[in-house]
Regions:
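Sec-dependent bacterial lipoprotein signal peptides
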Residues: 1-33
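Gly/Pro-enriched, hydrophobic low-complexity segments
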Residues: 35, 39, 168-284
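Edge/loop elements at the starts and ends of beta-strands within beta-rich repeat scaffolds
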Residues: 62-70, 81-85, 92, 113, ...
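Transmembrane beta-strands of outer-membrane beta-barrel pores
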Residues: 76-80, 126, 252
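Solvent-exposed loop/turn segments connecting transmembrane beta-strands
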Residues: 80-84, 103-112, 223-227, 253-259
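An acidic-aromatic
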Residues: 98-149, 288
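Flexible, processing/modification-adjacent segments and terminal tails
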Residues: 126-197
Length: 292
């Protein structure tokens, strides 16, 4: 990158914002669904046949997005508290193995990310720096336990495993959608209304009643009031048989309020990919120190 391009990119995307955005994309890289639903109405209210948790879980699993290789291009906008940045991402994935990203602004690459099951790495090409570590820092930054499976699922609209076993998952219906949760909705409202606290985090998945694709994933920890809310919409048919969410929205409320909006413009399935990633010898390692 020449000096002029480097200066211009740095002005648009300062290092501290770039690092934060890269980490957010690495940690994520899970509105309501707007496609039409053929729901029976009675006096303006939808009517859905009740399904138990076993049936809903089976339908959820059967309709999850399946792939071995994935290549995509997407635009993203991140807001950390009141600071907003937009950028484009070239994404490549091999299921259960590698997530690779090239993050650019105005056509200039500013960062490259490589995520595996046990490591998170990225290079900052603007300042000749790199980060190499595990999920510990990302988890602390977002106040949430993160792992590879969670990141992979959230990037393609698949389910994230519940903390509790399947026998404790409660079925329900909310706003013309099926739900699966670790706490029933009426109990959740009762607890919140009386200002009580639950010892375990509450988790819910919302399902489109026709396709059984996920429209929302919600995690809520009552003490100290942390939440993660993911929405998936604009499902399109890919590979002639599968629905893929072309728009995603993530909202994290913790020490910082973080919002990420993603819109895919291209998704290609099951073409073998490469994951070019190299840390030049002259790059300086980024070391994040915990606040005392």
């Amino acid at each position: 990158m020449n000096s002029k391009s480097r200066t211009y990119f740095y002005f648009l995307f300062p290092q501290n914002k770039l690092v934060a955005t890269v980490l957010l994309m690495a940690s994520l890289s899970f509105m309501s669904c707007k496609h039409q639903q053929k729901i029976t109405l009675n006096n303006g209210k939808c009517i859905l046949d009740f399904k138990n948790s076993k049936a809903l879980t089976a339908n959820l699993k059967a309709n999850e997005f399946k792939f071995v290789w994935l290549k995509g291009k997407l635009s993203a906008e991140s807001t950390i508290d009141s600071t907003t940045n937009s950028f484009t991402v070239s994404l490549r994935m091999k299921k259960d193995s590698v997530i690779w990203m090239s993050i650019s602004k105005l056509g200039i690459e500013g960062a490259r990310v490589l995520i595996t099951k046990d490591s998170v790495k990225f290079t900052n090409t603007i300042n000749n720096k790199y980060f190499k570590g595990d999920y510990t820092y990302l988890s602390k930054m977002l106040n949430s336990e993160l792992d590879y499976e969670m990141l992979q699922s959230l990037l393609v609209g698949n389910s994230v495993e519940f903390y509790d076993d399947d026998e404790k998952i409660k079925p329900g219906i909310d706003n013309c959608q099926y739900t699966l949760g670790t706490i029933r909705k009426y109990k959740l409202r009762k607890v919140i209304g009386k200002g009580k606290e639950l010892k375990e985090p509450a988790q819910s998945i919302y399902l489109n009643p026709e396709t059984f694709k996920i429209t929302r994933i919600l995690f809520y920890e009552f003490n100290p009031g942390r939440s993660f809310d993911a929405h998936f919409e604009n499902y399109e048919l890919k590979d002639s048989t599968q629905l893929f969410p072309m728009k995603m929205n993530y909202l994290i409320k913790a020490q910082k309020n973080i919002k990420i909006d993603i819109e895919y413009s291209k998704v290609i399935l099951n073409e073998e990919q490469t994951f070019p990633f190299k840390i030049p010898d002259n790059y300086e390692q980024i070391v994040f120190k915990e606040k005392q």
